[in-house]
Curated annotation (Swiss-Prot):
It is an enzyme of class 2 (transferase). Nucleotidyltransferase involved in the post-translational modification of proteins. It can catalyze the addition of adenosine monophosphate (AMP) or uridine monophosphate (UMP) to a protein, resulting in modifications known as AMPylation and UMPylation. This is Protein nucleotidyltransferase YdiU. It catalyses: L-seryl-[protein] + ATP = 3-O-(5'-adenylyl)-L-seryl-[protein] + diphosphate; L-threonyl-[protein] + ATP = 3-O-(5'-adenylyl)-L-threonyl-[protein] + diphosphate; L-tyrosyl-[protein] + ATP = O-(5'-adenylyl)-L-tyrosyl-[protein] + diphosphate; L-histidyl-[protein] + UTP = N(tele)-(5'-uridylyl)-L-histidyl-[protein] + diphosphate. The gene is ydiU. The keyword Magnesium applies.
Length: 478
């Protein structure tokens, strides 16, 4: 679909060096880099060298950014280098981020700094280990030149691997321009790539909307349980594959509070932690609008009721997905009508007392074995926790599993190690300011097994001191 992209050549960095290589992901992709010189890898994954036969492109898309429509966005500092078929037979995009200007760069330089690229690496690997669908970083390469933001910073290029880079904004780009034929081609391509079970079916475009809604409901439910805040849920950052994409101002929550916002540009709290399900539904409505002329070509308005039903049904889809995981994290057997209230009361309890989201869920598993000391220590007084615990214990009667088995199952759902904001900043600062990758590698070691408590990793489980956490802000890094 040449209308959907523009050819582009990455800018040649003066002195590329490989900062990080994801050997596990490379093996998953079937890339045999064992005998490849690091310098050669650095040139390849910085854009200095182009693989034989590759034709890099920058993709076009539109998007609602903080609710306002931008009809022409596109890859301003990224390009699609090519595709590979991984060892599971799945097609994966290989893209460079920070490789220079493209036809969509507008006034930007198309470059990226080491810090934001390592943030994407760290958080993407954490999400993968947590079982949350995500894009991943194959490599981070320094460029040997500074990029200029508030001050000069060391430049870097990230190699991103994604199921695809098809977004709600991709559809919006052509819908805005009334290019229905292109929308039709794009929809068929999306179906072939991500939802092949729908190919050739009557009503496939409405079914595509429903399938995307299902994947997004599952994804956002996982975000919410992990305490993850994306920070910039614009429609151009909703991937139709159901993967998490674009880790600009993202962060993980410490104290549980629905209004938590970290992004420095989210002044109104549009993308706050507690708003994420509703924003996903809003984005889905924008996707539905682009599909109306495909669902009912003769009269797009006639498609509105069916599309609206799917969009309005997103809330129930999400709630079901969220409650499924909540039951597992609470160690519950079977389903009861009051399970939602039990889970909601737990979250309200955490919010009321400013309790750490991750540790509260994790230490609740101790309580299943009658060892509630660590959980109780998170609260200002035991009395704050006692009434809810009585309800929770009552819900576990009768039970068919032994307490240690219940606790073990709960720990498989509730991680101990997440990318704590102060640890991420510590790692980024060491790499950016001193060229020291040690803190990044140690953090990744902890995050690669988030559910397994291990000796020597206590500091990776603990939230930041109050003075470090207060006022913490993240930035897009553009």
């Amino acid at each position: 679909m040449p209308e959907a992209w523009a050819p582009v050549r990455p800018e040649t960095p003066p002195a590329p060096e490989l900062l990080y290589w994801n050997a596990e992901l490379a093996d998953e992709l079937g890339l045999d880099a064992g005998q490849t010189d690091k310098g050669e890898l650095a040139r390849l994954f910085s854009g200095a060298d182009i693989p034989e036969g590759a034709q890099p492109i920058a993709q076009a898309y539109a998007g609602h950014q903080f609710g306002g429509l931008s009809p022409s966005l596109g890859d301003g500092r990224a390009l699609l280098l090519g595709e590979v078929t991984d060892r599971n037979g799945q097609r994966r995009d290989i893209a460079l981020k920070g490789s220079g200007q493209t036809p969509f760069s507008r006034r930007g330089d198309g470059k990226a700094a080491v810090g934001p690229m390592l943030r994407e690496l760290i958080v993407g690997e954490a999400m993968q280990a947590l079982g949350i669908p995500t894009t991943r970083a194959l490599a981070v390469t320094t460029t040997g030149e500074p990029v200029y933001r508030e001050r000069p910073l060391p430049g870097a290029v990230l190699t991103r691997v994604a199921a695809s880079h098809l977004r709600v904004g991709t559809f919006q780009y052509f819908a805005i321009r009334g290019e229905t034929a292109m929308l039709n081609k794009l929809a068929d391509y999306t179906i072939a790539r991500h939802y092949p079970q729908l190919a050739g079916r009557d009503g496939r475009h409405l079914a595509l909307l429903a399938a995307v809604a299902e994947r997004q409901a599952a994804l956002i439910a996982r975000w919410m349980h992990a305490g993850f805040i994306h920070g910039v849920m614009n429609t151009d950052n909703m991937a139709l594959s159901g993967e998490t994409i674009d880790y600009g101002p993202c962060a993980f929550m410490d104290a549980h509070y629905p209004g938590t916002v970290f992004s420095s540009i989210d002044h109104q709290g549009r993308y706050a932690y507690g708003n994420q399900p509703a924003i996903a539904q809003w984005n889905l409505a924008r996707f539905a609008e682009t599909l109306l002329p495909l669902i009912s070509p003769d009269d797009p308005a006639a498609a509105v009721p069916a599309a609206t039903e799917i969009v309005e049904g997103f809330e129930d889809l999400y709630q079901r997905r969220w409650l499924e995981q909540a039951r597992r994290k609470l160690g519950l057997e079977g389903e009861r009508d009051d399970d939602q209230a039990l889970a909601d009361d737990w979250l309200m309890l955490l919010a009321a007392h400013g309790v750490d989201h991750t540790l509260a869920w994790r230490y609740l598993a101790d309580e299943a074995e009658g060892k509630g000391e660590r959980l109780a220590a998170l609260f200002p007084s035991p009395d704050a926790l006692t009434p809810w615990l009585k309800q929770w214990h009552a819900r576990h009667v009768p039970r068919t599993r032994r307490p240690p088995d219940i606790a073990a199952a709960m720990r498989r759902e509730s991680p101990l190690y997440i990318p704590r904001n102060h640890l991420v900043e510590e790692a980024l600062d060491a790499a950016s300011e001193r060229g020291d990758m040690g803190p990044t590698l140690k953090l990744l070691e902890a995050l690669h097994q988030p559910f397994a408590e291990r000796d020597g990793l206590d500091r990776y489980a603990q939230p930041a001191a109050a003075e470090l956490a207060e006022g913490y802000r993240t930035f897009c890094g553009t």
